[in-house]
Amino acid sequence: MKGENEINKLAEEFVACKDILMAVGDENRLHLMIEMMQMGNCSGVRVGDITEKTHLSRPAVSHHLQILKAAGILNMRKEGTKNYYYFNSDLTSMKRLIRALQMAVDIASELPDRSEMQGQNAEFAAAIE
């Protein structure tokens, strides 16, 4: 089993990944990311273009894009008064989340299998009633 240091490191990584976890934890933001990927415009997409592809209002799309940007998933560039959103090319925050999740899988996979205890707990509970 992994030691306390590894578990503490995992806890620190999850805290560091809080923004991206919150960003991808919303169904609307996941939908926006998928739509942007399907649009495939490397130079970026405007809020209005994305709004046309979703059921969300323009202010809602803008709000969700800002959260994705703050989480490091998207970047934005300005051309005059126009804002173009595009995927961050280094994807550092997404890679960090993947590493944290892999660390969690590694730790959890070393824990003892407790599935057989479920039946034992039910039998014990029935016996004391």
Language-model-detected regions and their locations in the chain:
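Secondary-structure transition/capping residues
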Residues: 28, 43-44, 72, 112-115
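Amphipathic alpha-helical dimerization/coiled-coil segments
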Residues: 2-17, 34-38, 86-129
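N-terminal helix-turn-helix DNA-binding core of bacterial DNA-binding proteins
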Residues: 15-57, 81-92
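Canonical helix-turn-helix DNA-binding module
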Residues: 47-76
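Short, Lys/Arg-enriched C-terminal cap helix and immediately downstream tail that follows
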Residues: 72-74, 80-81, 98
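Generic detector of contiguous secondary-structure segments
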Residues: 7-23, 61-69
